[in-house]
Amino acid sequence: MSKIFVFGHQNPDSDAIGSSYGYAYLKRQLGVEAEAVALGTPNEETAFVLDYFSVNAPRVVESARSEGVNQVILTDHNEFQQSISDIKDVEVIEVVDHHRVANFETANPLMMRLEPVGSASSIVYRMFKENNVEIPKDVAGLLLSGLISDTLLLKSPTTHASDPAVAEELARLAGVNLEEYGLAMLKAGTNLSSKSAEELIDIDAKTFELNGNQVRVAQVNTVDISDVLSRQAEIEEAINSSIKSNGYSDFVLMITDILNSNSEILALGSNTDKIEKAFNFVLENNHAFLKGAVSRKKQVVPQLTESFNV
């Protein structure tokens, strides 16, 4: 069998990198020639993780076919618009994910492992256990980091009942204190001062097709929402430019306070009435407070989907 690429979504976060790195390692232990690659450079949080566990960043690829690869495995995503550029020209043979299934179609049967847990890394951990393969320290560290990132250190409503035990076991294997390491890791991802507005709105962004509309939903983590809002003018300029150049109908930016577990929603586009309806708030100067919201997957995208489909 020829080489298989394993990768997470575009604009990869710690779970996209961690789950693909871990699953590629597992596949190699099972006799498959698999390489973890990335669809973008790691963000600052993930760079902290890679440095902490002395792991080289996976190489960034633009397409699979240009690398001579015809089969791919997706982790932490399934929607084609979030995947590799030539996704429709290669065979998807596996998916390991914890998101909704949408805009996904294959010509051949495949293995799909979908679970409503806190992270794709949680699923990969279970697959190691099921195959009786030992998890080395670096893999444990990256899987743990993916789980911490996606659940905000197990505080997000996306946290599954099984996730705390998974986190404790991975922390033990990685040789770290869960709380101390988790907080340091999350804080590493909140250093936004060096980012341009264009970079800021693209750190962790995904496009969703909602009733024929291409809606971009981005999220940045911070310890002070006001610091981000102080740059509102330049952020809005970057958002409007992104809308125009990419054909988005709307752009929603979640500015998430990781210490107090709240978000400010900044929204621009042609359907702001639907966005207001989704969250039962009124945008003032294009933004509004969303108490208790920290999860794009559970507290933003489902609400937008329902509102746009009415």
Swiss-Prot record:
Give the Enzyme Commission number.
3.6.1.1
**Location in the cell:** Cytoplasm
Q: Name one Pfam family in it.
A: DHH
Catalyzed reactions = diphosphate + H2O = 2 phosphate + H(+)
The cofactor binding remark recorded in the entry reads: Binds 2 manganese ions per subunit.
- What cofactor is this protein dependent on? Mn(2+)
Q: Which residues bind Mn(2+) 1?
A: 9, 13, 76
GO CC annotation: cytoplasm
Keyword annotations for this protein, in alphabetical order, are: Cytoplasm, Hydrolase, Manganese, Metal-binding
The entry lists its GO molecular-function terms as: inorganic diphosphate phosphatase activity; manganese ion binding
Main localization is cytoplasm
Q: What class of enzyme is it?
A: hydrolase
Cross-referenced SMART domains, in alphabetical order? DHHA2 (SM01131)
Q: Where does Mn(2+) 2 bind?
A: 15, 76, 98, 150
User: Which protein family is named in the record?
Assistant: Belongs to the PPase class C family.
Protein name as annotated: Probable manganese-dependent inorganic pyrophosphatase
